[in-house]
Amino acid sequence: MHLLLIKIQELLSRSTKERVNISEDIIEQFGEDCKTAFRKQFTEERNKEFSIRMSSIGKPLCQLQMEKNKSSSESPPYNFKMRVLFGDLIEAAAIGIMKAAGIKIQSEQKEVHNELSGVKIKGTYDVEIDNKIYDIKSASPWAYDNKFAKGFNNVKEDDNFGYVVQGSLYSDSSGKPFG
């Protein structure tokens, strides 16, 4: 088992039995990250100009072309914003828990750029730990059991969402390996 996961599981297990000390700085940062996520999803202006982001690489090409050409598409379902917000909040909690577990995060939420065939692609990776880039993903129990729990090779073989390419672009852009 990976050392990072062991540290996280140890903290979480201990917290079920006793009070754990978490610094006020970590708690305050978690609160700020949650406020930022809420504002981002509900109150910030949306960029109307099309651009490919590293996180959208897994979308079907025809969908990206329609977005670029401003073709009308169906509105996302009413619960779409909640799913995206939950992902942001889980990410904030995961980072706070990693810090509380004593994991040294070298950088977080860092914007990176890459150029492919003359097209500038932006992205924001989640965390850098031990000079490696990691991307935090939230998943339903089904997705976890059937995709992520089976390891990286399983994700690589059936990567409908472009996670492997996304991680590779973060890695290439930062000059650091993908964890």
Spans of features found by a protein language model:
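Metal-dependent nuclease catalytic cores that hydrolyze phosphodiester bonds in DNA/RNA
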Residues: 1-133, 140-157
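Metal-dependent nuclease catalytic cores in nucleic-acid-processing enzymes
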Residues: 92-101, 155-179
